[in-house]
């Protein structure tokens, strides 16, 4: 579908979804954001739903300002995927050992490594910029510096919620490795600190929604946030890179005889800020549950733990600020999913997938998400499909 413009907004809100299908609270969030004087436009992706801080599946383009609550607490959350030389025929009939080996190599939930991972020992890890990255830790907010040891030990860990690690097959039978994670606790600590700082500023006292508090260009507060934001985004990138290196090491050991090779890793943020230029304006573009889909940009759009995912290539549609959806999008809250579905439902909806099927992940059941095929179809003018994947192993935190 092409986009529709939402009526009654202060600036253009272009929506790649049927407005009638979007919750009223999410529509109100979008209209509230449109009232900010720095806003130049909003794009809304087909996986749109109500979110904390700002609407998930929204792209917020501002000039001279940024809203830290819109970025959210998982700064730099995103996806990584890599195609391997393995095929479905190489996989064992019982995939439980493979799942167990992944869980042993990569801490999940609140877990962390006993010692910081040495990236120099990991297969294919891009060490460029690693030392400089950690050298900048001394320049981030004093309020979180005491978390350095935890930050080093959580580097290369999954977390919980909708974060996952998967073995997938594409339609040709090739095996892909895929994972989803962000900046872990250090990102949350930085986000919480700066959201609190923004809400104290005088120019944010009369907002329609206190979550819309912004930092303004050329102020010390904006400079501090940008520094910490971009550092946390880099943390998330390295976190996924280390996990992918650990994942690849598991695969190489488990399939020694196959002498596995890997294509270049595809990686993309979907909760972040980027400096981009549109219509002659330098803008700060916040993608809150959206990926960059500039012309030729590769991206990853996952479904749920029992449905397909897609590797896509951006078409460079500037009406969407070169963006696309970050996933299928929730059709109900976590609490609603827990009330509606049982572990039996989870078992039925994840048949054929080696994964957890207990009450702790019922809120991640496929039925709690929108149909991924519909979401992809609604953004045919934003991305083209490169590969469709279906998971056979899924590790959740």
Spans of model-derived segments:
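Domain-length cofactor-binding catalytic modules of enzymes
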Residues: 2-29, 37-41, 50-56, 65-68, ...
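Glycine-rich phosphate/pyrophosphate-binding loop regions near the starts of catalytic domains
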Residues: 59-60
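N-terminal cap/recognition module
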Residues: 64-85
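Compact, glycine/acidic-enriched structural inserts
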Residues: 78-117
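Active-site- or binding-pocket-proximal scaffold segments within functional domains
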Residues: 122
